[in-house]
Amino acid sequence: MPGLVENLKDLHALVHELDDTRMTTMAQVSNLPMENEQNDITDVVSYNHYFGWYGGKLEDNEAWLDAFHEMHPERPIGISEYGCEGITTYHNDNPKGGDYSEEFQAVYHEHMAKIIEERPWLWATHVWNMF
């Protein structure tokens, strides 16, 4: 998109002009490449990822985070959205992605809690829950 990067840089500069104590961030969509120049504009960056729910598998979360951290070891990275849907009346003794069961929802969030805890360099994480 022509002008997008310049606009983002202008907004970042304006924030710091108005309040130099305030950090800037941006939530990137999952398919934006790690090496995209947008990732270098704000003070910190986050990605919306739903690996293991809308596509891919649960283990893609840690693989992606570790690859981003390896590529940008000094760049603060966060997860601006993650999660999966569950329906209170759906249950499954063998939960799997896409079944909407409460059991898979528990598996998903327990997995995410573990990988988040193991990566102290994550600056923020946000479960998507309709906010």
Question: What is the meaning of each model-derived region?
Answer:
Residues 1:
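Active-site neighborhood of divalent metal-dependent phosphoester/pyrophosphate hydrolases
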Residues 5-29, 34-131:
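Substrate-binding clefts and catalytic carboxylate motifs of secreted carbohydrate-active enzymes
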